[in-house]
């Protein structure tokens, strides 16, 4: 999860997030290289004493600075499109869990377990235990399995919300009257935090998401322990 004064991304807990971090690092390297070359060219132009007033055009140079940026953009776009299609793939999920956004809490429904439904509210500061995270703890966590594809069906009952867990690489809008879906496969057990990422009213900041990822064998025993 995030920590104070963090400059980088959170550690990946899904293959999609691993791909996103790799793509981010590669794009950042390309940006630094381009910025360095531009600054070097500008500084050289400003400091050089060599001038040539007879140059009218430079076809070779113009061709290079037209083709080279196009090649760089293509090299950035291809992995970006690959990750985009990865996030939209729905390949036979093992479990389906429905998440409904409200002002200002979440409702979860385990459709594969007899329609088990429960609400998840933020814990007020007075109810926090030592070591708990302010504005991030909830009374009922959503429990999810690792090493199995899970489909999240996300909607809203009132206004726009967004179900987001950064470490899983998930951010899906909850839209009233519309059922959005996303599939992920978690790779590590643990407790991971997120928040509603769409401004949804006065208490938007008090709408955390807490996912507890557990081994598949334990999850298959039944998610009743979430209550």
From Swiss-Prot:
Enzyme Commission identifier(s): 7.1.1.9
Chain segments annotated as transmembrane: 15-45, 60-87
Coiled coil regions in record: none
UniProt-annotated binding residues for Cu cation A2: 196, 198, 200, 204
Positions annotated to bind Mg(2+): 198
Main location: mitochondrion
CDD domains: CcO_II_C
Swiss-Prot/TrEMBL catalytic activity: 4 Fe(II)-[cytochrome c] + O2 + 8 H(+)(in) = 4 Fe(III)-[cytochrome c] + 2 H2O + 4 H(+)(out)
Record keywords, A-Z: Copper, Electron transport, Magnesium, Membrane, Metal-binding, Mitochondrion, Mitochondrion inner membrane, Respiratory chain, Translocase, Transmembrane, Transmembrane helix, Transport
Keyword hit for Metal-binding: yes
Cofactor binding comment, as recorded: Binds a dinuclear copper A center per subunit.
Pfam families: COX2, COX2_TM
Side Mitochondrial intermembrane, residues: 1-14, 88-227
GO terms under cellular component: mitochondrial inner membrane; mitochondrion; respiratory chain complex IV
Record GO terms (molecular function): copper ion binding; cytochrome-c oxidase activity
Domain of life, per lineage: Eukaryota
Positions that bind Cu cation A1: 161, 196, 200, 207
GO biological process, one term: ATP synthesis coupled electron transport
Topology of the protein relative to the lipid bilayer: Multi-pass membrane protein
Residue spans, topological domain Mitochondrial matrix: 46-59
Record InterPro entries: CcO_II (IPR045187), CcO_II-like_C (IPR002429), CcO_II_C (IPR034210), Copper_CuA (IPR001505), Cupredoxin (IPR008972), Cyt_c_oxidase_su2 (IPR014222), Cyt_c_oxidase_su2_TM_dom (IPR011759), Cyt_c_oxidase_su2_TM_sf (IPR036257)
Physiological role: Component of the cytochrome c oxidase, the last enzyme in the mitochondrial electron transport chain which drives oxidative phosphorylation. The respiratory chain contains 3 multisubunit complexes succinate dehydrogenase (complex II, CII), ubiquinol-cytochrome c oxidoreductase (cytochrome b-c1 complex, complex III, CIII) and cytochrome c oxidase (complex IV, CIV), that cooperate to transfer electrons derived from NADH and succinate to molecular oxygen, creating an electrochemical gradient over the inner membrane that drives transmembrane transport and the ATP synthase.
Family according to the record: Belongs to the cytochrome c oxidase subunit 2 family.
Subunit structure: Component of the cytochrome c oxidase (complex IV, CIV), a multisubunit enzyme composed of 14 subunits. The complex is composed of a catalytic core of 3 subunits MT-CO1, MT-CO2 and MT-CO3, encoded in the mitochondrial DNA, and 11 supernumerary subunits COX4I, COX5A, COX5B, COX6A, COX6B, COX6C, COX7A, COX7B, COX7C, COX8 and NDUFA4, which are encoded in the nuclear genome.
Protein name per the record: Cytochrome c oxidase subunit 2
Species annotation: Papio anubis (Olive baboon)
């Amino acid at each position: 999860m995030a920590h104070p004064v963090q400059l980088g991304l959170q550690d990946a807990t899904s293959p999609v997030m691993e791909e996103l971090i790799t793509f981010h690092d590669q794009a950042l390297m390309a940006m630094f290289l381009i910025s360095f070359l531009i600054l070097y060219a500008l500084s050289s132009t400003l400091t050089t004493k060599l001038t040539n007033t007879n140059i009218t055009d430079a076809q070779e140079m113009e061709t290079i600075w037209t083709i080279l940026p196009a090649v760089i953009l293509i090299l950035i776009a291809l992995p970006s499109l690959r990750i985009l299609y990865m996030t939209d793939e729905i390949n036979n999920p093992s479990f389906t869990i429905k998440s409904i956004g409200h002002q200002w809490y979440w409702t979860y429904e385990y459709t594969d377990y007899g329609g088990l439904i429960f609400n998840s509210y933020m814990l007020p500061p007075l109810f926090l235990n030592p070591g708990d995270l302010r504005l991030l703890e909830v009374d009922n966590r959503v429990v999810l399995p690792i090493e199995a594809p899970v489909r999240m069906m996300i909607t809203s009952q009132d206004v726009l919300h967004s179900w987001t867990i950064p470490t899983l690489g998930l951010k899906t809008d909850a839209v009233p009257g519309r059922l959005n879906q996303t599939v992920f496969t978690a790779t590590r057990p643990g407790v991971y935090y997120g928040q509603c990422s769409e401004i949804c009213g006065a208490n938007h900041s008090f709408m955390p998401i807490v996912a507890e990822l557990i081994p598949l064998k334990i999850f298959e025993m039944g998610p009743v322990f979430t209550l």
